[in-house]
């Protein structure tokens, strides 16, 4: 792998440690990326263990060839939202000992201008995690209604100036279509008055478009529900989020399945019956990166790790 696009896995020890790996366990790395977490899992697995990695980025599939000679490893080209389907095809539902998810965009994707994820590097306005299929960011911006753009910017980017930015994009695109990341970033920088300190004005809009183009939050919802289906009793869920939208979904999911079903007050029901509706147990509190890790890898700053265990009921 090129050093230019090298990737440092965030919260590596904590995330893999949270899986509580067994020698002969079966694990899923739902976001293979460049293999940092997978490598750590394989180092802890015994010879009878198994790791199933998933990624929809063709470059990640290419990077997975580094483990081609390891019989314990296999890679699946697809989105992690479909992990339950892949596990079912393998006949392993209820036998998975741990699921790891490292959400968001990877450093190699950000650093490669040709992928179109970064407003700091000029490149084609693409933003697809799987650049072999689907609509690009440029294609969406060329056709989207003002209301649709404003909704995406507000909902997925928490952008305060969503409507104003959407109107300006619509006004400009008829004269000059937005085909490059620099075109879009420069427009947003030019029209944004109240700029946030230490944050590029295009940050929230780029995040919003990326999330929308790749259906990222839907993928997370599907992956969490799928993980609950495939995990064995005492199986672990270890998830890294990078912004509040992701972490909110993960936190609420763990809380909902840790508390069990809500029961109307006064209904004659035993504690044992309530316990049987609980499917997860949160393991500790949310874990943040240390100051030392942030110093080594600035992109770790916003990361949050949450770990949960499948209950045996």
From Swiss-Prot:
UniProt subcellular location = Cytoplasm
- Keyword annotations of the record: Cytoplasm, Methyltransferase, rRNA processing, S-adenosyl-L-methionine, Transferase
Q: Does the keyword rRNA processing apply?
A: yes
Q: What is its EC number?
A: 2.1.1.199
A GO molecular function annotation here is: rRNA (cytosine-N4-)-methyltransferase activity
Single Gene Ontology BP annotation: rRNA base methylation
The kind of enzyme this is, by top-level EC class, is transferase
Catalytic reaction annotation: cytidine(1402) in 16S rRNA + S-adenosyl-L-methionine = N(4)-methylcytidine(1402) in 16S rRNA + S-adenosyl-L-homocysteine + H(+)
Tell me where it mainly resides.
cytoplasm
Q: Where does S-adenosyl-L-methionine bind?
A: 35-37, 55, 80, 102, 109
* InterPro entries associated with the record: RsmH, SAM-dep_MeTrfase_MraW_recog, SAM-dependent_MTases_sf
Q: What are the record's GO terms for cellular component?
A: cytoplasm
What the entry lists under SUPFAM superfamilies is as follows: Putative methyltransferase TM0872, insert domain, S-adenosyl-L-methionine-dependent methyltransferases
Instruction: Write out the similarity annotation.
Output: Belongs to the methyltransferase superfamily. RsmH family.
Function comment: Specifically methylates the N4 position of cytidine in position 1402 (C1402) of 16S rRNA.
Q: What is this protein called?
A: Ribosomal RNA small subunit methyltransferase H
Taxonomic lineage of the native organism: Bacteria, Pseudomonadati, Pseudomonadota, Gammaproteobacteria, Alteromonadales
What is the gene name?
Answer: rsmH
């Amino acid at each position: 792998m090129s050093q230019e696009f090298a990737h440092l896995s965030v919260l590596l020890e904590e995330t893999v440690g949270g899986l509580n790996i067994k020698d002969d366990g079966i694990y899923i790395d739902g976001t293979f990326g460049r293999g940092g977490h997978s490598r750590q899992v394989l180092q802890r697995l015994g010879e009878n263990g198994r790791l199933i990695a998933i990624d929809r980025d063709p470059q990640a599939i290419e990077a997975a060839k580094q483990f081609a000679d390891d019989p314990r490893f296999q890679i699946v080209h697809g989105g992690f939202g479909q992990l339950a389907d892949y596990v079912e095809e393998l006949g392993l539902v209820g036998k998975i000992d741990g699921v790891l998810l490292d959400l968001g965009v990877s450093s190699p994707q950000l650093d490669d201008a040709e992928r179109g994820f970064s407003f700091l590097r000029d490149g084609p306005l693409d933003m697809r995690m799987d650049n072999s299929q689907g609509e690009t960011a440029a294609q969406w911006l060329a056709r989207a209604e003002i209301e649709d753009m404003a909704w995406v910017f507000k909902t997925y980017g928490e952008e305060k100036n969503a409507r104003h930015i959407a109107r300006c994009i619509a006004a400009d695109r008829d004269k000059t279509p937005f085909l490059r990341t620099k075109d879009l970033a420069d427009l947003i920088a030019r029209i944004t008055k109240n700029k946030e300190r230490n944050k590029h004005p295009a940050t929230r809009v780029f995040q919003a478009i990326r999330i929308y183009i790749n259906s990222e939050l839907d993928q997370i919802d599907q992956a969490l529900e799928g993980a609950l289906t495939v995990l064995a009793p005492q199986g672990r869920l270890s998830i890294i989020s990078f912004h509040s939208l992701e972490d909110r979904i993960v936190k609420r999911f763990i809380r909902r399945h840790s508390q069990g079903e809500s029961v109307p007050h006064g209904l004659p029901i035993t504690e044992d019956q309530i316990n049987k509706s609980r499917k997860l147990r949160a393991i500790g509190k949310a874990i943040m990166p240390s100051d030392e890790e942030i110093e080594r890898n600035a992109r770790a700053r916003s990361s949050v790790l949450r770990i949960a265990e499948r209950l045996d009921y």
